[in-house]
Amino acid sequence: MPSRLTPHKSPKEQVSWHHRFTMSEIATADIPDMRVSDVELKMPSSSPSYTSLTLQQLSESGYSSQELFFIIGSDAFSEIEQWHNYPNLIEQSHFVVISRSGLSNVEVRKKIPSLSGRMRTISATKDQIADLDRTTKSLSIWLIETKTRNVSSSDVRELLYKNQSTDGLLPAAVRSYISKHHLYSDRPHTTVLP
């Protein structure tokens, strides 16, 4: 689900929601049972896209908190206590925390000891991930330890700005879409620090 207006970025720093939605559809086209949600497009445009408001909108659309799994990197999750509407936010869905290079899930437990009792560690096997929704009746925070590349979306955008290879980082069809629509060819009007 592409964010309509990320709270920590200005509109000038973001490619349009329509393009991000289309790229998400292209990237997930071959994944069975996965679809990209447009719920954020339907939300009021006057406020930033806070996760808690999006999860509330999904709840009002008929999804129970037990059916929702918010997938997030360990680096972003480690800052969850600073997010809008915390701690209520973590009562709105399960959280699936994927380890990122430089911040293991063991370190996440240490950074947020108040949530440690709700955290469950599993390996990134297909069977364990498929069983997430059947292993507990309460909302959980699933820590998935896996090997990920040490690359961020900012790093990928930087490669695109420099017209460098993104092989292995972006599906070829997404890179083709980016080229066709001349996305990420100019830097946003912000200062980029080294």
Which positions does each model-derived feature cover?
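Nucleotidyltransferase catalytic core that binds NTPs
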Residues: 1-194
